[in-house]
Amino acid sequence: MASKITAAQVKELRDKTQVGMMDAKKALVASEGDMDKAIDFLREKGIAKAKKKSGNVAANGLARVKEDGNTAAIIEVNSETDFVATNDTFNALVDTIADTIAEKQPADLDAALALTTADGSTINDAIVKTTQVTSENVQLRRFAVVKKTDGQVFGSYLHQGGQIAAVVVLDGADEATAKDVAMHVAAINPEFVSRDDIPAERLDHEREVLKQEALNEGKPEKIVEKMVEGRLHKFLSEISLADQPFVKDGDQTVSQFVASKGGKLVTFVRYEVGEGIEKPVADLAKEVQDQING
């Protein structure tokens, strides 16, 4: 005869696992009221659900920066909808992942997923649990571990609560300056620290395109070279952080601003949630219904 499942048992299992009421009840029925077996059942069900959800497009989510001494971690964790991105459980997961990666500095994504968090579970286990709670595909998409020396400083900035994250390293400047540069990086999205970091083949290609563009405009060849250099300077100011007009003072470049504070640009990393992912057309009514249905 099947064991009768009480409301108290359902509440206890929900408190321990954060799953929905119906999932908790099903697990207790399947395990005949045995709490440990019910938890195992939910873990197995969560893994199955995570695998099922892994085919869904996860293009929302949050980016985060965590500093730990001379190490900083910048991460992006994705969800399917922005509903989940504002969920407390999802936010706690993002914080846990950022803390763990900053502390343990894994070499790649597989190593990161296998890391043990403060509560003894792995990052992968934590992701599976969050998938179980939210009924969405949740993924650690990418991360970077950034290092500095004792004489250098980090600056970090989150835009719109974590839709864009940036971390920079400056040499010889203070943290306030570094934060201003991080804000600039988040807003303007440079590709390289300086023109010296731009591959020669890309510069050569751009120079040739600009030359042909000027010739096609019918410009005399004797002034084409001067025009190309002027347009190339504009191109550099669009992709090189050092050459970009500083977002808080357009009369000076970022490198000039940093130099005025006694510093030098070292490196930066910028993540924008969902960049490069083809997003499905939003259907608000369906998103709401999916949340209701769990």
From Swiss-Prot:
Annotated region (Involved in Mg(2+) ion dislocation from EF-Tu) at 81-84
Quote the InterPro entries the UniProt record gives: EF-Ts_dimer_sf, Transl_elong_EFTs/EF1B, Transl_elong_EFTs/EF1B_dimer, Transl_elong_Ts_CS, UBA-like_sf
Q: Where in the cell is it found?
A: Cytoplasm
Stored Gene3D superfamilies:
1.10.286.20, DNA helicase RuvA subunit, C-terminal domain (1.10.8.10), Elongation factor Ts, dimerisation domain (3.30.479.20)
Please provide an example of a Pfam family that matches this protein in its UniProt record: EF_TS
GO MF term list: translation elongation factor activity
Question: What keyword terms does UniProt attach to this protein?
Answer: Cytoplasm, Elongation factor, Protein biosynthesis
SUPFAM superfamilies according to UniProt: Elongation factor Ts (EF-Ts), dimerisation domain, UBA-like
Q: Which GO terms describe its cellular component?
A: cytoplasm
Q: Which family does it belong to?
A: Belongs to the EF-Ts family.
Function, as annotated: Associates with the EF-Tu.GDP complex and induces the exchange of GDP to GTP. It remains bound to the aminoacyl-tRNA.EF-Tu.GTP complex up to the GTP hydrolysis stage on the ribosome.
PANTHER family in the cross-refs: ELONGATION FACTOR TS (PTHR11741), ELONGATION FACTOR TS, MITOCHONDRIAL (PTHR11741:SF0)
What protein am I looking at?
Elongation factor Ts
Please name the source species: Levilactobacillus brevis (strain ATCC 367 / BCRC 12310 / CIP 105137 / JCM 1170 / LMG 11437 / NCIMB 947 / NCTC 947) (Lactobacillus brevis)
Q: Lineage of the source organism?
A: Bacteria, Bacillati, Bacillota, Bacilli, Lactobacillales
